[in-house]
Amino acid sequence: MDCWAAVLGDCAGGLSREHYISDGIFDGEAITAYGLEWCKDHPIQISLASAVSKILCKRHNERFSPFDAEAAKLSRFLSANVLDDPLSEAQITLRGYRLEKWALKTFLNLGYIGGLDPEHHARLKPREDLVRYLFQETQAPKGIGLYFVTGAVSNAKFNVGLSWNAIRNLSRDGAIAGMTFTLNDVRFVVSAEEGPAEHRLAKIGLVNGVDYSRAKIYYRPHNIALLSKTAGQKTIALEW
């Protein structure tokens, strides 16, 4: 495979081994993979170092470092304050656009290796406008980007890691339009389509225990509050 950002015309350094899901969001040295072409039938535990693919050149891979670091900060905050110290109140401030671009990059990575199509593993070629939004100072049309989905988070059943499901636009022959994803039990959506997605997402219904028809969905939220009657409030402030 070629670098999926080659459309920019500035590739350099040859193809590098890119973690298709940022290694910084994980705590250990091993992960459980499932749904990819080589583990489509049952979960397989692999080393974190093995969860890579040559899908980006060295230059473009390295330019994602600030986005990966922002996602790692969120992952560590959730692990430390939901799992390890649930009783205390805690707050973190993150850069919203960096987190959004990390989510969009992960969506494009997974699409490029066929990870958004667990049945046929068809590969998704990144759209040029999305690639330019990631690497250049262009603005994405409103509606494209990160959404937060409300729902319960429990330290008793807390999971470190990332899970995802593709979102398909049935009015466009089932074309992949984004993905739902859960990072350390907090639910998000990244949309690749223009226009408000809240009503479209509500029509998804029940997916992996999350009822999108009842959840509240917020585009580019400024504050995410994890509330509890028995634990301290955790607040994620996003600067946009």
Language model: regions and residue ranges:
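Short N-terminal signal/transit or membrane-insertion segments
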Residues: 1, 21, 30, 110-126, ...
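An N-terminal structural lobe/cap that precedes and organizes the functional/catalytic core
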Residues: 1-69
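Generic structural hydrophobic/aromatic packing signal, biased to beta-strands
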Residues: 3, 20, 103, 179-181, ...
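Charge-rich, low-complexity amphipathic helices
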Residues: 28-30, 38, 78-82, 86, ...
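Short, low-complexity, polar/charged sequence segments that are solvent-exposed and flexible
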Residues: 34-37, 75-78, 199-200, 207-211
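Catalytic cores of phosphodiester-bond-cleaving enzymes
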Residues: 45-118
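C-terminal, charged low-complexity interaction regions
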Residues: 121-240
